[in-house]
């Protein structure tokens, strides 16, 4: 997740930055076009997204009977426990808890038949959902730190951080449901196509 998820979604952020500037975004008057080109290389440097996703679902979350996932879950739950006590963040803590549960259930559903071809057929949407869940945790932690430092959000940067956290929880985290649907059902729409069909 730390390698491949950012290489995919940071490029999307760069693309949106170009779009926000309109025609000017594609000129050298602003650095966003250079950022896009530089960030596009990350997807190449970090290896194939699908390979990283298959390694995550096929090996990393299963290692030592899921110990790594349990440790990550415990850290996320500790952050959620702090956030539940903050009225502005309690709903986000609950939403993150639900997302974490969905990822755990999808991990089990993917491997329900024990067939690696079925389990890994949707490794990419699994990693997208898992990555979004991890980022939701990071945003919850950022929101906690922001409110501790500036409870009234009197500093513009504090208001910006809280706005970004709200955005992620309202617009990005809900996407995991669609991604995990195909993981849960072990959908083979893409994997079942023969090479000749392409």
Cite the ranges covered by each PLM segment:
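Alpha-helix capping/hinge segments and adjacent helical runs
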Residues: 1-71, 167-189
